[in-house]
């Protein structure tokens, strides 16, 4: 059986002028799934839904407090605090960033974020693991910032160690902050992507491979 790829558009933090202003439909052609890592205007996400049949899955950023008064983006799917499955792809969503003040919503201490991740263990185990970790903030020590607001979460590293997802997609740390920040790197078997503004990548659409991943996950846990 011939294997095909799924084309994913990851977006975060900064609305892309290329998508916002000009020939949006053509630029979204061929995109199968859109993942938003947060801090994007509600109207921007809703605008994109008008030009693509691809579902838009999102987590909250620390500047998305307006969603609580204006409502969540219409036509999009919030995957915060759940393990959401799209065509066999198991996505764990954990939005927000490190707490750095008392004003903005979607800010968490390390302890609070770890508690959120722990609450998703049952969902993840029931589904035989996760394939993609979708967050707003980066992982601690993995291309995160040195200031309090942009420090990463250590528990994200633990999630990568435990579940070994194929991909970890985050935002929050703008690439313009440091010219040395990589767009893509890796940690173990996980490809780590900084989705600031926009980034397109492909993953295998292989139900057979996902079945094998689930089998390996359960073999790992049964051996403990």
Language model features: what each stretch is:
Residues 52-63, 153-156:
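A short, gly/pro- and small-residue-rich
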Residues 10-19, 63-151, 197, 220:
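Conserved catalytic scaffold of divalent metal-dependent phosphoesterases
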Residues 28-29, 49-53, 126, 159-163, ...:
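Short, conserved loop/helix-junction motifs that constitute active-site signature segments
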Residues 2-5, 11, 70-71, 83-87, ...:
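Binuclear metal-dependent phosphoesterase catalytic core
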Residues 10-13, 33-39, 57-62, 79, ...:
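Active-site neighborhood of phospho(di)ester-bond hydrolases with catalytic His/Asp-centered motifs
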Residues 1-51, 121-129, 223:
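N-terminal active-site segment of His-dependent metallophosphoesterases
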Residues 15-19, 40-46, 62-69, 99-103, ...:
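Active-site environment of divalent metal-dependent phosphoester hydrolases
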Residues 19-25, 42-46, 77-79, 118-121, ...:
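A generic local structural motif
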